[in-house]
A protein has these predicted regions:
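Juxtamembrane "helix-exit" motif on the non-cytosolic side of transmembrane helices
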Residues: 11-15, 49-51, 73-87, 115, ...
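Hydrophobic cores of alpha-helical transmembrane segments in multi-pass inner/ER membrane proteins
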Residues: 33-48, 98-110, 190-194, 242-258
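Membrane-interface helix-boundary motifs at transmembrane edges
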Residues: 48-60, 87-88, 114-124, 201-208
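Interfacial segments of alpha-helical transmembrane regions
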Residues: 57-62, 111-145, 213
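Membrane-interface interhelical connector segments
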Residues: 148-174
Length: 269
């Protein structure tokens, strides 16, 4: 209902609040970090809890998990550096390494909070995190390319250049100026919902699922609103982005947890 109503006020909202305040700049820089760190932690779990009964599987998990861990750390460092440069001016590229190492360290710390007895649950989380991240990345970029909705901050004549969220304006390829729909930051910020799975296998978070869920929703709303303040997206872009990300999480976790549960039941039989 909200999404259908937003086209009426989409442009007016952006024209009123898209002033790029400092808090919105900060959230542009850090908004996607939690999702990256949680996915990094999933890679760390693959490495730590790899199969030790088969040399092939053991080495495969070590190499594959190590490559993924390095790629996600590098990507997280680069993306954060890019947003820092965009908001603070060009900064040294050494920060790509520094930021990537910091994210990797936090991910490793999360991984080390898991007792050995929860190995299977941790690997299940890793599978969900990786598949979910990839699906978000693919769907986000495909929709941005196909929709071609112009960002508010790129408009010189908003009243004539504005299009509603449901209008497809393909531009013949991806162009960041026309990548307003859906909001990538919103889809990635919603990835923090992976936190609600952590209490299953991290003892320190036992009985904290409701708190983590509330934190997830608050984070999504705050980051989403900041994107409108930055003029990067319209309110409808943010709303659809969050909903799509949550839908992908529900789909991924439901399928993988159900499949894993059926496999474990068969093993018990």
């Amino acid at each position: 209902v909200q999404t259908c109503a937003l086209p009426i006020s989409d442009l007016q909202i952006s024209m009123t609040i898209a002033k790029k305040p400092d808090f919105a700049r900060v959230l542009e820089i850090v908004g996607e970090i939690p999702f990256t760190v949680l996915t990094l932690a999933g890679c760390g779990m693959i490495i730590r809890f790899r199969n030790r009964n088969s040399m092939v599987k053991k080495q495969g998990a070590l190499i594959g998990g190590g490559i993924l861990f390095s790629l996600f750390a590098a990507m997280g460092g680069f993306m954060t550096w890019n947003y820092l440069s965009r908001n603070l001016g060009e900064i040294s590229k050494i920060w790509i390494l520094i930021l990537g190492v910091i994210m990797a360290a936090v991910a490793i710390w999360i991984t080390m909070q898991i007792p050995e007895k929860n190995r299977k649950k941790a690997l299940r989380f890793a599978a969900v995190a990786l598949v979910y991240f990839v699906l978000v990345l693919i769907l986000m970029n495909c929709l941005k390319t196909v929709w071609g909705r112009m960002r508010f901050r790129e408009m010189t004549d908003p009243f004539n250049e504005f299009t509603r969220w449901y209008q497809i304006c393909g531009r013949g390829g991806f162009d960041d100026r026309y990548a307003s729909f859906p909001s990538g930051h919103s889809m990635n910020s919603a990835g923090v919902i992976l936190m609600i799975l952590l209490p299953d296998f991290i003892p320190a978070l036992k009985d904290k699922r409701k708190v983590l869920r509330v934190c997830t929703y608050v984070w999504c709303v705050v980051v989403g609103i900041s994107r409108v303040f930055m003029g990067a997206h319209f309110a409808s872009d943010v709303t659809v982005g969050i909903l799509l990300s949550f839908a992908l999480f529900d789909l991924t976790s439901t399928i993988l947890y159900k499949r894993k549960g059926e496999k474990e039941s068969a093993e018990l039989d």
